């Protein structure tokens, strides 16, 4: 018995010691306690709810904030559920899906207090508004936080969940009447408001919050800048848009078509998918049935916006007008921004068998069917075949790379110029970058998402098991500079910090004499480049971005591209 008592005492003592070692945050004003975990040399707080269950009668509706009672203890040691979505085979059974998914994770340096007031970086994940969640190890910012500490400008990182697909972007007349469109963007806004109101208890500064995202995450940052036409106060101070800020198709019919297909597949069509009866039927379905209908009707491919069919809606409320109109009228939050693209951002979406000008024209017409033949011909003239290489070894023609460059500029490159120019006119600094290095070199170049492993200083998370990819010393060095430049931007509103291991000379893009500067990140010619510098060592100048983007950003092209 004595031996048993000793063992039990030892177990209880060990358990108490482990519990005592766990990081804890006490919000004294609200009398709420959060218990987290130590992970990879930082402290993390997982699965913190910021919005109530979005299922049942709350489906498609704007989120409702969670307000814990005074004296609450929140166990933030386990991840919360992810929002309904199509899972990869390897993730099935490992992740909990629920409409009660509005939660966020926080990562911070060790041994902090509420008096520290660190800058805050908030990730909005990408994934085509179809997949994504805050448990994805690719978005883990443990190394980013540690890099920021080593750089002398420590940050706190936050990763949110938001609704996806039909759950987040349902679009009907009935929903618009009750102001329930753009539910996903409203989820994001609520998470940012939670950060504004609560992050001080974790040692964060609510007046130094940067939102950043890649692909549809970048579009989300853009939409948050445009939210409410800039008439409401914003719960952040800077934004970073990686590989998209706006998106062609937002004012088109991709989402309404997808909505009609889902409603019909779910047997909720009563003659009109826009009706209140159809909406009531969709709200009565269980999560699995509605998700199955969405998966069964999901359309991918170039002729379906490369899979981006669930898009923000011009609802007259969150987005009071078309994004291009809001930008042109300068109805947006004039915050400091950083926007960029990867050198060969969309190459993997282009058909490899394109070998002629007709093939180029047909591809553009398939992607953007409302662009006139006249304007497609103008694009072909602006991007002559002989300005592009061919890769005989890979079997890729000049017209393949020509198509990829036109497509990249339409989707990724020219919209930052549009937004940045108007933001600069409102006194908001804009920084442009072109990403020019990858951990996985190929004939396709520096692809969509190539920047992410470096920004998060998390190269291994982007290498599939069994892959022959081996990052080089240059890759690891770039990951230090990139991650520290992103966190430096969050701390100082500038990505370069003299005397620190950040990008050197990364200055704002609109400065004087009508020049436009782009920082080339990575590759053999890293550094600031003028888009009009056509010298032999200029990476950007030879791309004729001023002339080409002036056409792509013209009112006629914007109308035909539907944004």
Swiss-Prot record:
Keywords: Disulfide bond, Hydrolase, Secreted, Signal. Disulfide bonds join 83-101, 268-281. Its main location: secreted. Gene3D superfamilies: alpha/beta hydrolase. It comes from the Eukaryota. It is found in: Secreted. InterPro entries: AB_hydrolase_fold (IPR029058), AChE-related_enzymes (IPR050654), CarbesteraseB (IPR002018), Carboxylesterase_B_AS (IPR019826). This is Secreted lipase ARB07186/07185. The lineage of its organism: Eukaryota, Fungi, Dikarya, Ascomycota, Pezizomycotina.
């Amino acid at each position: 018995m004595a031996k048993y008592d000793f063992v039990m005492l030892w177990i209880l003592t060990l358990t108490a010691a482990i519990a005592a070692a766990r990081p804890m945050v006490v919000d004294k004003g609200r009398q709420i306690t959060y218990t987290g975990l130590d992970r990879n040399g930082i402290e993390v707080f997982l699965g913190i709810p910021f919005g109530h269950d979005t299922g049942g009668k709350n489906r498609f509706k704007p989120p409702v904030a969670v307000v814990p009672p005074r004296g609450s203890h929140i166990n933030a040691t386990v991840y919360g559920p992810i929002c309904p979505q199509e899972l990869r085979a390897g993730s099935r059974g490992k992740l909990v899906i629920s409409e009660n998914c509005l939660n966020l994770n926080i990562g911070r340096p060790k041994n902090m207090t509420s008096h520290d007031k660190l800058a805050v970086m908030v990730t909005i994940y990408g994934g085509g508004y179809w997949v994504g969640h805050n448990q994805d190890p690719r978005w883990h910012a443990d190394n980013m936080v540690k890099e920021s500490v080593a750089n002398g400008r420590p940050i706190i990182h936050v990763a949110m969940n938001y609704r996806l697909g039909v759950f987040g972007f349902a679009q009907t007349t009935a929903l618009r009447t009750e102001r329930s469109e753009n539910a996903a963007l409203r989820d994001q806004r609520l998470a940012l408001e939670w950060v504004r109101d609560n992050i001080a208890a974790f040692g964060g500064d609510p007046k130094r919050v940067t939102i950043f995202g890649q692909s549809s995450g970048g579009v989300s940052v853009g939409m948050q800048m445009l939210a409410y036409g800039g008439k409401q106060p914003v719960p952040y101070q800077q934004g970073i848009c990686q590989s998209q800020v706006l998106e062609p198709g937002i004012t088109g019919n991709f989402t309404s078509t997808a909505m009609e297909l889902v409603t019909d597949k779910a047997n909720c069509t009563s003659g009109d998918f826009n009706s209140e009866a159809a909406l009531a039927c969709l709200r009565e379905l269980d999560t699995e049935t509605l998700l199955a209908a969405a998966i069964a009707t999901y359309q991918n491919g170039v002729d379906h916006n490369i899979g981006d069919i669930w898009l923000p809606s011009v609802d007259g409320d969150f987005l009071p007008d078309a994004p291009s109109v809001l930008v042109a009228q300068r109805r947006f939050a004039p915050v400091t921004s950083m926007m960029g693209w990867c050198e060969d951002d969309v190459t993997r979406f282009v058909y490899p068998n394109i070998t002629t000008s007709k093939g180029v024209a047909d591809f553009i017409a398939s992607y953007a069917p409302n662009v006139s033949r006249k304007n497609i011909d103008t694009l072909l003239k602006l991007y002559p075949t002989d300005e592009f290489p061919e890769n005989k070894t890979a079997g890729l023609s000049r017209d393949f790379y020509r198509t990829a460059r036109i497509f990249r500029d339409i989707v990724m490159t020219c919209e930052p110029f549009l937004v940045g120019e108007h933001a600069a006119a409102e006194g908001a600094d804009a920084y442009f970058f072109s990403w020019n290095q990858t951990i996985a070199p190929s004939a396709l170049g520096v692809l969509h998402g190539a920047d992410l492993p470096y920004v998060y200083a998390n190269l291994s998370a982007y290498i599939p098991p069994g892959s022959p990819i081996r990052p080089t010393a240059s890759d690891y060095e770039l990951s230090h500079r990139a991650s520290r430049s992103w966190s430096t931007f969050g701390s100082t509103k500038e990505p370069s910090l003299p005397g620190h291991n950040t990008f050197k000379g990364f200055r704002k893009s609109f400065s004087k004499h009508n020049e436009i500067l782009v920082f080339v990140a990575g590759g053999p010619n890293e550094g600031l480049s003028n888009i009009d510098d056509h010298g032999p060592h200029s990476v950007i100048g030879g791309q004729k971005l001023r002339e080409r983007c002036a056409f792509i950003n013209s009112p006629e092209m914007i109308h035909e591209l539907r944004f």
